[in-house]
Structures are given as structure tokens and as C-alpha cells.
């Protein structure tokens, strides 16, 4: 993202200039709607958050082939997995040079999407508290009241049987450096997901009653 007349990572921008400046940079890079909040965290933090939900059943069809799964003693059948085991498996994939970062990201999306879908009624009670407990490790512009608001929104969604949706954004991955760089394809995917017009930067859905 742009920062101090150069490009840098979200983590470096956050450490140097704080959450508000990072929000400005993200909005500029991804053409986000006005008022958008952001929440980013590492795989380690995600594992700690997901561990509150217990084991879930995950299928990797569409993310990994049968041969790829067999290398790690797994199959394409839906299988039970804990947050810790999922994190370990994903780390193995990331370290395996035979797997592209894009394939690893697809597997990661499949795993954590399953954790969020496991029991919608748990989300309002557990996710905000789990995020608060890991607040020092988050990259976010959430204020204290935003975690409460998140719980309210999640409760509304759970009561109306809304389902979480996870996607792995396209972009430029550098496996050795462990970095991800936003590209034109990344921007287009975000704009499609949020129904954002690149010209206006506004979400049409936000204008609906």
C-alpha cells in the first residue's frame, strides 16, 4: 500500500502511522466504500480465535486434488479437524514449494469458512470476545464499541440464517518473502464482492433501505 511516497506492508504502515492512516491507504488501494472498517490478523491469531469453536467438518474439494491431500495423509472426503490441526496442516502447505500460494490460500479459505459456518449461534457470543482477547495482535481500526456492534450484527445475521462467505483474493504472492501485493485483479475482485463502483467508491447496497 502507498505510504510516505513509497509502498509498504499493512503491518509496517500500522506500526508507523496507526490505524486511521492504514484505513486511508486501504481505501485508496482497494477503492473501498466510505466508512469501511478493516480487520486483519495472522494465521496464528486466527487459530487462537477458531479454537473456541471446537472441531469442525471440512471438505477440500475444489481447493486441493486427491493426490495433493494424500501427501499429507488426508482425503477429499469431508473430515473432522480442530483449529490447531488445521493451522498445522495449512503451515505445512505453505512451506511446501510444490504448492503455489494461490492454492494454499484456497485451502485456507475452505478451512476457516467451515469454522465460521459450524454454528452460527456461537458467533455473536464468542467472536467479539475472541477478537478482544487478541486485540494487541490485530491490525484494525475497530474501537471498543465496534466489537459490541459486531456482536449485534452477528446476532441479527445468525437469527436470519445468513451464511458467512470466504474468498481468496487474487494478487501477487511472494512465497519466499511471505508477502502479498494488491494487483488490478485484486481491486476488481473487491469491487465485485462489495458491489463498488471504481468511479464513485460507494457501495450501491448501502443506499437501499
Q: What function would you assign to each model-found segment?
A:
Residues 1-7, 139-209:
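C-terminal solvent-exposed extensions
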Residues 32-35, 117-128, 146-149, 202:
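Short, surface-exposed acidic
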Residues 16-75:
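Amphipathic, coiled-coil-like alpha-helical scaffolding segments used for oligomerization/assembly
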Residues 51-131:
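Flexible, polar/acidic helix-loop-strand segments at domain edges
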Residues 19-27, 43-47, 51, 87-90, ...:
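Extracytoplasmic/secreted envelope proteins and their assembly/folding machinery
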Residues 8-17, 31-37, 94-103, 119-120, ...:
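Second-shell loop/turn segments in exported
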Residues 1-3, 43-48, 63-67, 118-119, ...:
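Solvent-exposed loop/turn segments at secondary-structure junctions
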Amino acid at each position: 500500500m502507498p505510504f510516505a511516497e513509497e509502498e509498504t506492508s499493512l503491518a509496517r504502515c500500522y506500526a508507523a502511522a496507526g490505524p486511521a492512516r492504514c484505513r486511508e491507504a486501504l481505501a485508496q488501494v482497494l477503492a473501498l466504500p466510505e466508512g469501511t472498517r478493516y480487520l486483519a490478523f495472522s494465521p496464528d491469531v486466527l487459530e487462537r480465535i477458531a479454537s473456541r469453536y471446537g472441531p469442525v467438518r471440512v471438505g477440500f474439494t475444489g481447493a486441493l486434488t486427491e493426490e495433493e491431500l494424500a501427501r499429507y495423509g488426508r482425503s477429499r472426503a469431508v473430515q473432522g479437524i480442530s483449529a490447531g490441526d488445521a493451522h498445522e496442516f495449512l503451515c505445512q502447505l505453505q512451506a511446501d514449494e510444490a504448492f503455489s500460494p494461490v492454492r494454499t490460500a484456497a485451502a485456507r479459505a475452505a478451512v476457516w469458512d467451515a469454522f465460521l459456518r459450524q454454528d452460527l449461534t456461537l458467533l455473536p457470543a464468542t467472536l467479539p470476545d475472541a477478537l478482544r482477547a487478541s486485540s494487541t495482535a490485530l491490525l484494525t481500526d475497530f474501537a471498543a464499541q465496534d466489537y459490541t456492534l459486531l456482536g449485534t450484527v452477528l446476532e441479527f445475521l445468525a437469527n436470519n440464517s445468513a451464511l458467512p462467505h470466504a474468498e481468496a483474493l487474487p494478487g501477487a504472492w511472494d512465497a519466499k518473502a511471505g508477502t502479498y501485493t494488491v494487483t488490478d485483479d485484486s481491486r476488481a475482485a473487491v469491487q465485485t464482492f462489495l458491489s463498488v463502483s471504481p468511479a464513485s467508491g460507494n457501495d450501491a447496497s448501502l443506499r437501499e433501505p
